[in-house]
């Protein structure tokens, strides 16, 4: 049997596994001369491509029947030129109500590191807009790898100007310097939707509500609405994909998506929702959320069933009461729901990058109890207390204390019998470690939805007048820093096995972060094992924005969160509080001089952080060569309304972080440069 027939069999198996129609490349195919007319109204959510490989890419569209012109099958054309004079692949795919009129198409047999154009054609000859896509370089291709990573786009109360900026800049670069793909790290949709007529002035926390997502069913929880079935989730994706800037981005680059929490439910674990503080079994809803994600994301992921459509497993909503050693519920309906779609995957991108993507939400543990803990006014948790609570029954090798001491306080340990805080699960953890060990590219990039970097500050150094804010002897306070058992397992393995080039890219935090992941921080042993970068949100509201809108001016210690300038403007000093300590932010309040404030820094506080901006919107790009990796933060102002200019509007700053590939036993070292604008208190 010849290699071509073997390749066809392999691609057919691949297409079947991911539920996509297949077209195998034909370099001699010519476009038919039939007159074709573009009808974007018949393809209202545009076109997209995803998960590029050296020889294939997934293509996607939605051909709606709502315009009065029905279609049952679409032809798909892939060409090496935007005029479609030279076709390289052609096939057809069904569109049915079973997939909400979406379709997925695996264009295979393509050449590596190539630019292609594609379109969909209905039975009447109407065409979609033309999409552009790119294949990955071959495994031995050492050209620089360039990609963007993004997260947290909320089109119901913000504009996607960050995509406009990305599109504008990329189109003006030489071909060899353009982005190869966009890594979307989750919160592609926000399932929480406020309806403008239900909020004062049609506003929510200073943002204009668009009303562009309205659930056909839904449930009102507090002041917002959430999905209750598959139709609701599909409605959210349809509404989001009407955004012109998101459509343009998906038409220009292949996307590589994973999900975060909002694709299912913002407060949930596995298949269980938390509504008004009560746990609600939601196995059916978890399956529905996974199906909608699968239908609207062009990703090479494994789904339930073997056919071309998502075959939803039959599940019942049941409480989850029994958990394994990492907190994964063993109730059969829960296991079926969380495994209905497996988005964790790994791929090589040229010679310089091994990409590993994990599912950080489907297997996340329930979270421990925080009942009976002392009331602390300061917005942080004592690090020593979190160290015990976070690890649950696994603390100290399975010997957690019955009580926790915090200075002069002592109280029962509510988590001594609970599973540890974890999010990968035992099976995915083993898979991840195997893939990390097997990675041979210089840069091992972990696509992580929410990141591992710890945020902490030093309220123990507050002036005596604020002693009531923090328990005596409590030490450092942590704002984010859970899942320590899993992180130590991974980072200790990286250190012990001499793995270099570990790079974590993340989202979720609505903030820009740059730093070094480490198993521990001072006064415990600090030994970084890699570098980590977190991108700001595309449009979702930041902590800095919320603080400036809601924090009273007479609130004690306001200066730790907001720096009030003499001219009446405000800046997020929470960045300085976490980077340099409470004394630095208090000196800033007194002097107004960032240099004097940084001179008062606590050097033990955050040696793992080089950059932090809790008021940053935008995106990040990565450039990876054999011996260096560069990450650039592109920050824009709050995107309240869509920019009227093609460049997406003004910039706040552009900052790069470079790191040379380090050797086993060495520590990575980030080098920072401000290329444009002023990041202010973020450094």
Show where each model-derived region lies:
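Hydrophobic h-region of N-terminal signal peptides that target proteins for export
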Residues: 21-25
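N-terminal secretory signal peptides and thylakoid transit peptides that target proteins
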Residues: 1-19
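Long, structured stretches of catalytic cores involved in phosphate-ester chemistry, encompassing
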Residues: 14, 28-683
